[in-house]
Amino acid sequence: MSSCSRVALVTGANRGIGLAIARELCRQFSGDVVLTARDVARGQAAVQQLQAEGLSPRFHQLDIDDLQSIRALRDFLRKEYGGLNVLVNNAAVAFKSDDPMPFDIKAEMTLKTNFFATRNMCNELLPIMKPHGRVVNISSLQCLRAFENCSEDLQERFHSETLTEGDLVDLMKKFVEDTKNEVHEREGWPNSPYGVSKLGVTVLSRILARRLDEKRKADRILVNACCPGPVKTDMDGKDSIRTVEEGAETPVYLALLPPDATEPQGQLVHDKVVQNW
């Protein structure tokens, strides 16, 4: 087991906002920071970049679309650290609006990574989360636009305090199926797979927070979703108005909430402010 028992993990951390979050955690978090990437060479290059800046991250390969890869990471964290203190679920995919890929394929691939794989990360790693742990799920303000463009019936379901994880999974599966059957608009869905995927992540964060409050309240584990804002990354494009360092501020703020904090919990946070939606 590592001589340092505290550990923070950032997924999709070889570039962009994930790398910026890992960099800032290396500076501020009291413990080891493990950055992950699907591509080993790119992940190790990111580690070398941070080492050149005088920081000391660790690297572990992770493909969040692969459940066995997630479980290998879980076993590593359990063996090396006895668990996990901070989880930042940043890894995601986004298609450009002019991408010629069929809409239903975009929907399936986007939901697979952004929602279902993120859910797998939470379900595999929350059981080893230590007391006062912090889970930060990177969402997007596009989730709010997606919500506004949902039918009233779907809005009520997403807002419901009794919505279960299983119910949410069924809704996300239905969106994918409705796109395949070319009926998603008629069924009340918006035309944004990315927005729907991040809406799912935001609602999942609320459901997981509620479950933790019911089953592990004394551990004070906080789960929140956040929007970094329009950041200059490969995903958001060069014309976005924020640097990756600015985009990392709210995720890092949530990751480093003090041990006695009880809120925010299960919220969507933008610019360190809870969003009402």
Curated annotation (Swiss-Prot):
Q: Among the record's GO biological process terms, what is one?
A: cognition
Q: What is its EC number?
A: 1.1.1.184, 1.6.5.10
Keyword check for Acetylation = yes
Catalytic residue positions: Y194
> Disulfide connectivity?
none
Q: Per its record, what are the GO molecular function terms?
A: 3-beta-hydroxysteroid 3-dehydrogenase (NADP+) activity; carbonyl reductase (NADPH) activity; NADPH binding; NADPH dehydrogenase (quinone) activity
Q: Does the keyword NADP apply?
A: yes
PTM sites of type Phosphoserine: S30
Q: Where in the cell is it found?
A: Cytoplasm
Cellular component aspect of the GO annotation: cytosol; extracellular space; nucleoplasm
N-acetylserine: residues carrying this PTM: S2
What does the UniProt keyword field contain?
Acetylation, Cytoplasm, NADP, Oxidoreductase, Phosphoprotein
Which reactions is this enzyme annotated as catalysing?
Answer: a secondary alcohol + NADP(+) = a ketone + NADPH + H(+); a quinone + NADPH + H(+) = a quinol + NADP(+)
Q: Pfam families under this entry?
A: adh_short
Q: Which CDD domains match?
A: carb_red_PTCR-like_SDR_c
Where does this protein hold substrate? S140
Tissue specificity as recorded in UniProt: Detected in ovary, pancreas, intestine, colon, kidney, brain, thymus, lung, heart, liver, spleen, leukocyte, prostate and testis.
What is the relationship between pH and activity here?
A: Optimum pH is 5.5-7.
**Top EC class of this enzyme:** oxidoreductase
Binding site residues for NADP(+): 10-34, 38-42, 63-64, 90, 194-198, 239
Domain of life where this protein originates: Eukaryota
**What family is it from?**
Belongs to the short-chain dehydrogenases/reductases (SDR) family.
User: What is known about what this protein does?
Assistant: Catalyzes the NADPH-dependent reduction of carbonyl compounds to their corresponding alcohols. Has low NADPH-dependent oxidoreductase activity. Acts on several orthoquinones, acts as well on non-quinone compounds, such as isatin or on the anticancer drug oracin. Best substrates for CBR3 is 1,2- naphthoquinone, hence could play a role in protection against cytotoxicity of exogenous quinones. Exerts activity toward ortho-quinones but not paraquinones. No endogenous substrate for CBR3 except isatin has been identified.
Q: What is this protein called?
A: Carbonyl reductase [NADPH] 3
Q: Which organism is it from?
A: Homo sapiens (Human)
Q: Its gene?
A: CBR3
